[in-house]
Amino acid sequence: MKRIAFVFSTAPHGTTAGREGLDALLATSALTDDLAVFFIADGVFQLLPGQKPDAVLARDYIATFKLLGLYDIEQCWICAASLRERGLDPQTPFVVEATPLEADALRRELANYDVILRF
């Protein structure tokens, strides 16, 4: 089976991309264990706790990221440069444990995957 990477690069709640990506990730995890999740650019906001999507009439899917461990999804990476650019601290208690990587290391890790799905 091919190695699959899910890349979240959009902010939550502005579009359905984040929710659809999470749904696809969880569904794919039933078919393969060889997958990883990457959070880059505005996608780092997907992992912030305490969001209030009901204020913009959106569904609160962010808490569902906490289920990644139950689905045996353990390879989670977050772009350290994206965090800095957005004024976020890598020590922030995100809703899922993601390992910060600098952009060049993140690119090298991403190159190990056969299929890259971006949301």
From Swiss-Prot:
It comes from the Bacteria. Its main location: cytoplasm. One of its GO terms (biological process) is tRNA processing. InterPro entries: DsrEFH-like, Sulphur_relay_DsrE/F-like, Sulphur_relay_TusC, Sulphur_relay_TusC/DsrF. Pfam families: DsrE (PF02635). Keywords: Cytoplasm, tRNA processing. One of its GO terms (cellular component) is cytoplasm. It is found in: Cytoplasm. HAMAP family: Thiourid_synth_C. Heterohexamer, formed by a dimer of trimers. The hexameric TusBCD complex contains 2 copies each of TusB, TusC and TusD. The TusBCD complex interacts with TusE. Belongs to the DsrF/TusC family. Part of a sulfur-relay system required for 2-thiolation of 5-methylaminomethyl-2-thiouridine (mnm(5)s(2)U) at tRNA wobble positions. NCBIfam families: PRK00211.1 (NF001238), sulf_tusC_dsrF (TIGR03010). This is Protein TusC.
